[in-house]
UniProtKB/Swiss-Prot annotation:
EC number: 2.3.1.274
Family to which this protein belongs: Belongs to the PlsX family.
GO biological process terms, semicolon-separated: fatty acid biosynthetic process; phospholipid biosynthetic process
Recorded catalytic activity of this chain's protein: a fatty acyl-[ACP] + phosphate = an acyl phosphate + holo-[ACP]
Subunit-level organization: Homodimer. Probably interacts with PlsY.
Native source species: Streptococcus pneumoniae (strain 70585)
Subcellular location: Cytoplasm
Protein's name in the database: Phosphate acyltransferase
Summary of the function given for this chain in its UniProt record: Catalyzes the reversible formation of acyl-phosphate (acyl-PO(4)) from acyl-[acyl-carrier-protein] (acyl-ACP). This enzyme utilizes acyl-ACP as fatty acyl donor, but not acyl-CoA.
Entry GO MF terms: phosphate:acyl-[acyl carrier protein] acyltransferase activity
Cellular component aspect of the GO annotation: cytoplasm
InterPro entries to which the protein is assigned, alphabetical: FA_synthesis, Phospholipid_synth_PlsX-like
SUPFAM superfamilies assigned to the protein according to its UniProt record, in alphabetical order: Isocitrate/Isopropylmalate dehydrogenase-like (SSF53659)
Keywords, in A-Z order: Cytoplasm, Lipid biosynthesis, Lipid metabolism, Phospholipid biosynthesis, Phospholipid metabolism, Transferase
Lineage: Bacteria, Bacillati, Bacillota, Bacilli, Lactobacillales
């Protein structure tokens, strides 16, 4: 049985969206058990599942504006902290939260703990491409600064994930840069390039540019945390902008535009779904001793369900243990 500790109080629509997503996951997956951490009375309002689920009550939670590290240290009974401790103590196999990203990263670093020989765990997510296959990118902001050695580790981590969780036999690994030529980039990018070229275990395809990411140029894209987070926000903003422009064009375009939208309704719905990468799951803090997964703060029940499905696959494929063995040299 795969045991998942869930912070029921994190996120914009908690606990309703969290619990409703859990209900659906428990219905569909008979091999998971969920521990819900949070306000028992509020959780029970939405909990319909009666088997393989438990509630661990706490009145304390971490708010979105709390300073991450201080919150983890001072709010010992917060729902997120208790969920992370359950993983550390072996009472759960993975932790999920839609709450404060920085606090969850801190919980992953300081409570769950790093895998031996991994210097800086990175935040990774599967982002959308035009062909619907997506690409994995890390680091998306777990670290403000990185070395070439960190980026090399991210390439190995991302490749492991793409192989074992997404089923890609030979993941194409690209280094995000300001040009595709091998001579491009600052000293960090140039040093990283040399490390990736020298690693024969990687299917390294060279430098990739941000403009080509959504065209599926690579299966795994490696970046420092600052750059990766900026790219992530750009993709999110572009997706919202496209949908906003379409809505404005339709509502302000008169009868012809509305009729056209009606005819294209299924296609537009498909486009919206394709741009909504939360259907794939959450962002994984990769490099810690167990799956620590952050679903978007505005996640609805469907996104929570998708993230639980993602965690289930990670546990099923034992990707974290495989990664630990690889980095420990066993």
């Amino acid at each position: 049985m795969k045991k998942i500790a869930v912070d029921a109080m994190g996120g914009d629509y908690a606990p309703q969206a969290i619990v409703e997503g859990v209900n659906q996951a428990l219905s569909d997956f008979s091999d998971i058990e969920v521990q819900l951490y949070g306000d028992e009375a509020k959780i029970k309002q939405y909990l319909t599942a009666t088997e393989r689920v438990s509630i661990i009550h706490t009145d304390e939670k971490i708010d979105s504006d709390d300073e991450p590290t201080r919150a983890i240290r001072n709010k010992k009974n917060a729902s997120m902290v208790l969920a992370a401790k359950a993983v550390k103590d072996g009472e759960a196999d993975a932790v999920l939260s839609a709450g404060n990203t920085g606090a969850l990263l801190a919980a992953g670093f300081f409570i769950v703990g790093r895998i031996k020989n991994i210097d800086r765990p990175g935040l990774m997510s599967t982002l959308p491409t035009v062909d619907g296959k997506g690409f994995d990118m890390l680091d998306l902001g777990a670290n403000a600064e990185n070395t070439a050695q960190h980026l090399h580790q991210y390439a190995v981590l991302g490749s492991f994930y793409a192989k074992n969780v997404r089923g890609i036999a030979q993941p194409r690994v690209g280094l995000l840069n300001n040009g595709t030529e091998s001579s491009k980039g600052d000293p960090l990018r140039k040093e990283t390039y040399e490390l990736l070229v020298a690693d024969e275990s990687l299917n390294f395809i060279g430098n990739v540019e941000a403009r080509d990411l959504m065209n599926g140029v690579a299966d795994v894209v490696v970046a420092d945390g600052f750059t990766g987070n900026a790219v992530l926000k750009s993709i999110e903003g572009t997706a919202m902008g496209i949908m906003g422009l379409l809505k404005t064009a339709i509502t302000g375009g008169g009868l012809r535009a509305k009729l056209g939208a009606l005819l294209l309704k299924d296609s537009l719905r498909g486009l919206k779904k394709q741009l909504n990468y939360s259907d794939v799951g959450g962002a994984v803090l990769f490099g810690v001793k167990a799956p620590v997964v952050k679903t978007h703060g505005s996640s609805d029940a469907k996104a929570v369900y998708s993230t639980i499905r993602q965690i289930r696959t990670m546990l099923e494929t034992d990707v974290v243990a495989q990664t630990a063995r690889e980095f420990s040299g066993e």
